[in-house]
Amino acid sequence: MLGMGVFKQLIKELYEWLLHSMDMATQHLVAIVLKISVVKYLIKEFHDRFIYFIDLLAQHFIIVALSGFLVLVFGVLIGVFAFYNSKARAFLLPVVNFLYTIPSLALFALFIPVIGVGLKNALLVLVLYGLLPIVYSTYNALKEVREEVIKAAIGLGCNPKELFFRVHFLLAIPQILAGLRIAVVMLVAMAGIGALIGAGGLGQAIFRGLNTQNTTLLVAGSLIIALFSVLADKFVSVFQHENALQRLFSQNATQKQKRRVYTNLAVFLFLLLASALWLIPRNAIEEKPLVVATKPSSEQYILGEILSLLLEKHHIPIKRAFGIGGGTMNIHPALIRGDFDLYMEYTGTAWVNTLKNPLTQKVDFETIKKRYEKEFNLLWVGLLGFNNTYSLAISKEDAQKYAIETFSDLALHSQNFDFGAEFDFFEREDAFKGLMKAYRFHFRSLHEMDINLRYKSFESHKINALDVFTTDAQIKELDLKVLKDDKGFFPNYQAGIVIRKEIIKKYPEALKILEKLDSKINDETMQDLNYQVEVLKKSPKIVAKDFLERLGL
């Protein structure tokens, strides 16, 4: 029987052959049909998730508006200070340059221990990133004011304050606006990455689409961000057109220019107010909602929705903070700080990564529960019933070719395999580092990639061995051979609910509600739920709702 990857390759080759066999008119017709099909899927996505996209758009607008305002204020102030103070200039300009060179994800992660996750973190990073074009455009504009203009102003009796506001700053406005246009477009794009730290915004749609293999959702989120950036650039260009803002400040703007500037500002303020009002809980909840966090994967989105829907059914207000980048590394400290209230964790991750136990020790759930309560004031509320442990997988064809059943068998033939895994797999002691010591693999090549690209790389034959989670839907879709960990290297990764102890005091009924999920999901059930989201392209919320209804919860 043909593997799914081979089948897809045959379809692709057949499509290319048909395309080359067609005349130009037929090719154009096919292209039009494909475009209509894509647009149809996008329209359906927008229709089905209208409220979801409006929420994200409002969040994104507020993030960009606040960060853009702060960037403009601080950027101009720093640029002016650098212009007037040569010692400060020698320090400030290189620092602004340096901040811009730091990878954005690293900067987001850097501030998590200091100010936590969410909007505050996102605003700080966006402001630091957005300073460069504003600072340099302000500084260069002030520096380029001609000497004869300055002398003429002084000759007319301008004092230093008037010289700055009526000459330097007034002449610098067009260049500052040019810098602002660059900064705003950059902020619109950068704000999308803020979704990884729970800041919300349209990036959430992109990362959710990536994590759940939902290309339509990914494209929809990307298109809205692209449209947003075009409109944001257009907004700033109104002030720049025919030097409208400069002429307004110099009190010689035409009525048409005044009308355009004031209308532009009025529309902006209206949208800002509308976004703020939209994001106020529509059911006027006065009490602070519980924040449910998840890691960035389909399984976690589904489990997060199961928790959220179950608690909401019992009238407990919920806020979703799904797809937090870095997983446990960022969620656990945020939970301790109170930024999040509960999430799904795995016993193996808790045992090795959080509690720092050696891999040689067997995972002991009772010890995990006691230490979490004692050291972090966190409670484990039972286990769901499935073990999403690591394993390694290859194609069934390669398994048959080399007679591979176990990790040890793979080690003997590892020189014939290109191995791929997510970035953190190569760094963790309970993953690649320890695995190499236990099995002595000598792979032909190693490929680090985003966790959601492993299977695509396998399908495209860039790798032929990879790490998997035993509940992954793609194991079933691609008909992979999951190998046996014959030395028992990987610990158990039983899924359980971790919640702040204070929440149980506030909502004592939450404990009994969550305990209803104890032992309700086995490995096959979890793999099927993942399959519905990643392969059948169902919404995690719909899948979670159907699952709870089947359980009578």
Swiss-Prot record:
Residue numbers on the Periplasmic membrane side: 282-553
Effect of disrupting the coding gene: Disruption of the gene inhibits EGT uptake.
Topological relation to the membrane, as annotated: Multi-pass membrane protein
Entries under PROSITE patterns matching the protein: ABC_TM1
Primary location group: membrane
Domain of life: Bacteria
Pfam families on file: BPD_transp_1, OpuAC
Location of the region described as Ergothioneine binding domain in the Swiss-Prot/TrEMBL record: 288-549
One annotated Gene Ontology cellular component of this protein: ATP-binding cassette (ABC) transporter complex
Subunit structure: The complex is composed of two ATP-binding proteins (EgtV) and two transmembrane proteins (EgtU).
Free-text note regarding domains: In EgtU the transmembrane domain (TMD) and the solute-binding domain (SBD) are fused.
Other notes: The gastric pathogen H.pylori is unable to synthesize ergothioneine. During infection, the EgtUV ABC transporter gives H.pylori a competitive colonization avantage in the host gastric environment by allowing the uptake of this human dietary antioxidant, which is present at high levels in gastrointestinal tissues.
Name of the featured protein: Ergothioneine transport permease/ergothioneine binding protein EgtU
Native species: Helicobacter pylori (strain G27)
Taxonomic path: Bacteria, Pseudomonadati, Campylobacterota, Epsilonproteobacteria, Campylobacterales
